[in-house]
Amino acid sequence: MFLDLHPYTILVSIFIILLVKQIVGRIGKSTIQEFVWLLYLKISPNQAIKDYNTKKVELHEINKQKRSISAQDEYAKWTKLNRQADKLTSEIQKLNEEIRQSKASIDKLANVLLMVLTTLPIWVARIFFRKTHLFYLRSGIFPRYIEWVLALPFFPSGAVGLTVWMFAANSVIHNVISLVSFAFEKRVEKPVRQKK
């Protein structure tokens, strides 16, 4: 076998991958995609994005000037600013269409990256390490039928394989993350029975 890893290496790496997968699931793919997009906006060499940001700042300044003067008292200046604002708005809309295509490709790239980091390693491990004994239980710790279930699908009684380890680790990680995140969730008000 070309991937001859120690069983404890497999245990720890699968645990870390499952932990990352649960954290990604808790945060949400859309939140991660939005973070990647904002990061891309900051570091991108794309000229359309730079123009978009510059024009947004210009539009903000023009609108600020428009609000500071009276349309009745300084009509010519207000009209000139209004034309500039309309022109900038149309340019911003054109740039926004270009940027939307970039956002779609960045979102797709983020999805692929998340899949490569969380889902693909699990499937690779299931294929290559499905017959690897990860650890052994001493005989008599559990009743015989529980040892048999823990040895599923390919192992002699008393051995624990990847399938059972992944199931157990995923359950524990999910429960711990749920307990930790519960403390930060919005409080739910006690329901009050309505009188008839």
From Swiss-Prot:
Entry's Gene Ontology BP terms: tail-anchored membrane protein insertion into ER membrane; vesicle-mediated transport
Transmembrane regions listed in the UniProt entry: 11-30, 115-135, 160-176
One GO location term (cellular component): GET complex
Residue ranges of coiled coil: 76-114
Residue intervals on the Cytoplasmic side: 31-114, 177-196
Subcellular location: Endoplasmic reticulum membrane; Golgi apparatus membrane
Record key words, sorted: Coiled coil, Endoplasmic reticulum, ER-Golgi transport, Golgi apparatus, Membrane, Transmembrane, Transmembrane helix, Transport
Residues on Lumenal side: 1-10, 136-159
GO molecular function, one term: protein-membrane adaptor activity
Bilayer topology annotation: Multi-pass membrane protein
Chief localisation class: endoplasmic reticulum
Alphabetical list of Pfam families matching this protein: CHD5
Function, in words: Required for the post-translational delivery of tail-anchored (TA) proteins to the endoplasmic reticulum. Together with GET2, acts as a membrane receptor for soluble GET3, which recognizes and selectively binds the transmembrane domain of TA proteins in the cytosol. The GET complex cooperates with the HDEL receptor ERD2 to mediate the ATP-dependent retrieval of resident ER proteins that contain a C-terminal H-D-E-L retention signal from the Golgi to the ER.
PANTHER family, alphabetized: GUIDED ENTRY OF TAIL-ANCHORED PROTEINS FACTOR 1 (PTHR42650:SF1), TAIL-ANCHORED PROTEIN INSERTION RECEPTOR WRB (PTHR42650)
Family recorded in the similarity comment: Belongs to the WRB/GET1 family.
Subunit structure: Component of the Golgi to ER traffic (GET) complex, which is composed of GET1, GET2 and GET3. Within the complex, GET1 and GET2 form a heterotetramer which is stabilized by phosphatidylinositol binding and which binds to the GET3 homodimer.
Protein name as catalogued: Golgi to ER traffic protein 1
Organism: Candida tropicalis (strain ATCC MYA-3404 / T1) (Yeast)
Lineage: Eukaryota, Fungi, Dikarya, Ascomycota, Saccharomycotina
